[in-house]
Amino acid sequence: MKVAVYPGSFDPITNGHLDIIERGSKVFDKLIIGVLVNVDKKGLFEIEERVELIKKVTKHIKNVEVISFNGLLIDFLKAYNAKIILKGLRAVSDFEYEFKMALMNNKLDPDIETVFMMTSAQYSYLSSSSVKQVAKFGGCIEGLVPKEIISDVVRRSKI
């Protein structure tokens, strides 16, 4: 069974993330969405809220599981018998950072492979940070995040 982990802070989950999840779920037998605390970013949603938002927008995908974690990604993979890290790439600038992370993860555990998946072109500009910025200033986030969570993002952005 090919088990992959798609890690990220997903704060909030965007249509770009969902695109990778939907496509990744067709490639792997099981896809675990690893929701992490990113100490370098100020969060819009608490980790438990992010898990629930992701579950809400992925409930139609049967082989996806959403789990929060804190710590090393390699340890998370081992805990769930996963050998593959799935990473979405928007641009060459993403690749440079993700390539270094893939090398580090492989150094920590040579049995772990990182698979890169290009984001669909219509989402190549999209990031959680840009969604937060647009929502904070009252802009329309329709088409940027799954419709099921638009009201959650708008409501939280006004706080």
Curated annotation (Swiss-Prot):
Keywords: ATP-binding, Coenzyme A biosynthesis, Cytoplasm, Magnesium, Nucleotide-binding, Nucleotidyltransferase, Transferase
Pathways involved: Cofactor biosynthesis; coenzyme A biosynthesis; CoA from (R)-pantothenate: step 4/5
Gene Ontology BP term (one): coenzyme A biosynthetic process
Pfam families: CTP_transf_like (PF01467)
Localisation: Cytoplasm
InterPro entries: Cyt_trans-like, PPAT, Rossmann-like_a/b/a_fold
Site label Transition state stabilizer, positions: H17
Catalytic activity, reaction form: (R)-4'-phosphopantetheine + ATP + H(+) = 3'-dephospho-CoA + diphosphate
Residues reported in the UniProt entry to bind ATP: S9, F10, H17, G88, L89, R90, E98, Y123, S124, Y125, L126, S127, S128, S129
Cofactor: Mg(2+)
Annotated GO CC locations: cytoplasm
Keyword Cytoplasm attached: yes
UniProt main location, coarse: cytoplasm
Oligomer status and interactors: Homohexamer.
Stated role: Reversibly transfers an adenylyl group from ATP to 4'-phosphopantetheine, yielding dephospho-CoA (dPCoA) and pyrophosphate.
Protein name as annotated: Phosphopantetheine adenylyltransferase
Organism: Clostridium botulinum (strain Alaska E43 / Type E3)
